Amino acid sequence: MAKEKFDRSKPHVNIGTIGHVDHGKTTLTAAITTVLAKKGYADAQAYDQIDGAPEERERGITISTAHVEYQTDSRHYAHVDCPGHADYVKNMITGAAQMDGAILVVSAADGPMPQTREHILLSRQVGVPYIVVFMNKCDMVDDEELLELVEMEIRDLLTEYEFPGDDIPVIKGSALKALQGEADWEAKIDELMEAVDSYIPTPERDTDKPFMMPVEDVFSITGRGTVATGRVERGQVKVGDEVEVIGIEEESKKVVVTGVEMFRKLLDYAEAGDNIGALLRGVAREDIQRGQVLAKPGSITPHTNFKAETYVLTKEEGGRHTPFFNNYRPQFYFRTTDVTGIVTLPEGTEMVMPGDNIELAVELIAPIAIEDGTKFSIREGGRTVGAGVVSNISK
């Protein structure tokens, strides 16, 4: 069958495989590409091609991740698979691979294991919104009752972490048998992809979200006003729009965008991904600074206190060589600026070691525009020592 041309018109969704080590995440990834390749929807990838993922660096952190792409009748997918547990933790916290949904792989022969639980918790904390379950290795379990028991266990575990355990699709299959071309098991991969297609919604595009632009630089043009430059993170901004200047200062200010410029050309509007200069009326050069954001009024608010799921770099990654304790005061780098914050460790935790993954409570010395899911780096004197994602805002 001739290869179908890559279709840009299909909606794009980012997904990934998660679950306990050796439950079959990589085998499933290989099976999906192999089964879809028969329809001309993917390039078949062997297990070894996926497993030998190259190391990447994201915010100074070394992560091994395999990226594959494929399509179904209705969508185009980018799929990430990580070889090691630590790679998942780092990946999900840095947002190196932003997932719109995940396929949780659980071995039917073993049932949920410690990392099954950890990956579900991480998904909840970093905001992976939807999970579909693939019960793998069902060819090794003859007892129908045992399969039902494992399914119930998985559903209970998902419910425990506030996912809709009763409604989540659970597909029972065998990635290895599908990879080997056995038709009955291949059909289960099709069933899985149908569940992913229908259960994981198409994400809202960045351009459709409310406008936000982190301010990188500010200067004034005599007779015209103040210009703030930066890359539009989401949404669109048009000439004449009212925007809010948020962060650092206690009070947010409303200003009007009187001009949008990109590559020295004037535009009517700018959208997510554009590097622009926004000409602002009614604001002095000294009233706006790097580290603030311009945003659609009311869409994001400044905060000082939050909880965050964090990963602390190892010495080998260029991080700290020693643990840190309660009241640790590093800088938190949000988008374009560092703000000092005071760290409170969870009750019963004496110290945090390099390489740990932990939920910290943070109090910043100045308010910053943040929301659940906002990513940041933890730095000491310009050197990255950790990465985190806001999981809960308290003030």
Curated annotation (Swiss-Prot):
Annotated region (G4), positions in chain: 136-139
Family matches, as Gene3D superfamilies: P-loop containing nucleotide triphosphate hydrolases, Translation factors
Entry's induction text: Equally expressed in stationary and exponential phase (at protein level).
Keywords for the protein's UniProt record, in alphabetical order: Cell wall, Cytoplasm, Elongation factor, GTP-binding, Hydrolase, Magnesium, Metal-binding, Nucleotide-binding, Phosphoprotein, Protein biosynthesis, Secreted
Region listing for G5, in residue ranges: 174-176
Summary of the function given for this chain in its UniProt record: GTP hydrolase that promotes the GTP-dependent binding of aminoacyl-tRNA to the A-site of ribosomes during protein biosynthesis.
Similarity remark: Belongs to the TRAFAC class translation factor GTPase superfamily. Classic translation factor GTPase family. EF-Tu/EF-1A subfamily.
Protein name: Elongation factor Tu
